[in-house]
């Protein structure tokens, strides 16, 4: 299962997620996700990147999955329906590299950044649904162990409403 912290944040209040993840020394046969999700015990918020199917109901995550391709993607879902999938051509995932991810949620609207560069917008989640910071990594079938390191994360929301 992935790692979450608790359902303490809602888009209706607005929040910013930031996380840093370091890829393993081998990235073949690897899947990782980092972002926010409404579940903290799924075996991945996204079942398949290519078909954009999901186990979580409301989420916004960056996904790298070599079962599909070697592109990083940003995928979100609102109310159980995947509403946006976007390959991020500006970022190439490499071995043993640390990436900084950020997701800003205001109401139902989502904006995404990688290493300080805006890479996605107009994605949606259900702003009234509580979410948690989320990270998930696994080796694909038949491959050696893969461990991505979740170096740091934080979620902040405005002190005023």
Feature locations, PLM:
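Secretory/extracellular carbohydrate-interaction modules
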Residues: 1-72
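Ligand-recognition surfaces built from glycine- and aromatic
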Residues: 126-161
């Amino acid at each position: 299962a992935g790692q979450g912290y608790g359902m303490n944040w809602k888009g209706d209040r607005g929040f910013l997620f930031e996380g840093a993840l370091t890829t393993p020394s081998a990235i073949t046969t690897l899947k990782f996700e980092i972002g926010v999700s409404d579940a903290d015990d799924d075996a991945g918020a996204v079942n398949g990147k290519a078909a954009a199917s999901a186990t979580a109901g409301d989420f916004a995550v960056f996904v790298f999955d070599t079962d599909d391709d070697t592109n990083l993607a940003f995928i979100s879902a609102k109310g159980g329906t995947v509403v946006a999938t976007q390959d991020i051509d500006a970022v190439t995932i490499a071995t043993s590299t640390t990436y900084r991810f950020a997701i800003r949620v205001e109401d139902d609207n989502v904006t995404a950044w990688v290493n300080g560069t805006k890479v996605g917008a107009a994605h949606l989640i259900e702003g009234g649904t509580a979410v948690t910071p989320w990270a998930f990594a696994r080796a694909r079938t038949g491959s050696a162990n893969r461990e991505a390191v979740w170096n740091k994360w934080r979620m902040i929301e405005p002190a005023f409403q």
